[in-house]
Regions:
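Well-ordered alpha/beta subsegment
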Residues: 65-93
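Extended, Lys/Glu-rich alpha-helical coiled-coil stalks
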Residues: 76-79, 94, 98-108
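Short, charge-rich amphipathic alpha-helices with coiled-coil/heptad character
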Residues: 58-69, 97-104
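Alpha-helix initiation and N-capping motif
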Residues: 50, 67-68, 107, 132
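Membrane-associated alpha-helical segments
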Residues: 36, 102-192
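Loop-centered beta-sheet repeat module
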Residues: 83, 89-90, 94-96, 108-118
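Helix-boundary and N-terminal cytosolic regulatory elements
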Residues: 1-62, 87, 92, 130, ...
Length: 192
């Protein structure tokens, strides 16, 4: 499960996206918070998210008195990074759109780019949706300190906004793909 609030610990499982050239790799990360508020993370890779959260902790360690607070900080940093990824995909979509509307010949490579962007956008959206589920589960939990809940509500708004942006990019890609296929069809009809 993505989130489990058991008697002796809270467990949360997430996927973190890591850009690899024009696509992403998905790396699983698990968090466990004991009843004493100790946070343990289990991961196979190093992430910018953890380095950034560590910097925040070092600058203001009093604000991170429990593993609950540290987990929320990690999720905040990750949501910021997810926003960067959504923005990056949006720029790639805009570049493909510009390429198609430039009037240059549309070939299979353009269609492959569109397809790859659709896949990346869909995976990114699913990943952000998973984050939304975890945040909603934490919001329903009664075990987190009360001072965390206002931050959670803001984080959920941010995640909802990211989902909307990812949806827009996906819809735009559908439109771009339709336009590209239409232009290819026109080119083929002119040849005939």
């Amino acid at each position: 499960p993505k989130y489990s609030d058991a008697e002796n610990a809270i467990t949360s499982n997430s996927n973190f996206f890591v850009p690899q050239g024009e696509s992403f790799t998905v790396e699983p990360v698990s968090f466990l918070i004991s009843n004493e508020g100790v946070l343990v993370s289990m991961r196979q890779a190093e992430f910018r998210t953890f380095r950034e959260a560590e910097k925040r902790l070092q600058m203001n360690y009093r604000s991170y008195s429990t593993g609950y607070h540290i987990l929320i900080s990690l999720l905040e940093v990750r949501i910021d990074y997810d926003a960067d990824l959504v923005e990056m995909v949006g720029k790639q979509v805009a570049a493909v759109s510009k390429e198609i509307s430039s009037g240059s010949k549309i070939d299979k490579e353009v269609l492959y780019k569109i397809n790859a962007l659709q896949e990346n956008t869909m995976l990114l959206r699913e990943n952000i949706f998973d984050r939304q589920r975890v945040l909603s589960s934490i919001l329903r939990s009664e075990r987190f300190p009360n001072d965390i809940y206002p931050r959670l509500q803001l984080m959920l708004k941010d995640v909802n906004s990211l989902i909307s942006h990812a949806d827009f990019s996906f819809q735009r890609l559908d439109y771009i793909q339709d336009a590209a296929l239409g232009l290819i069809n026109i080119e083929q009809n002119e040849i005939v």
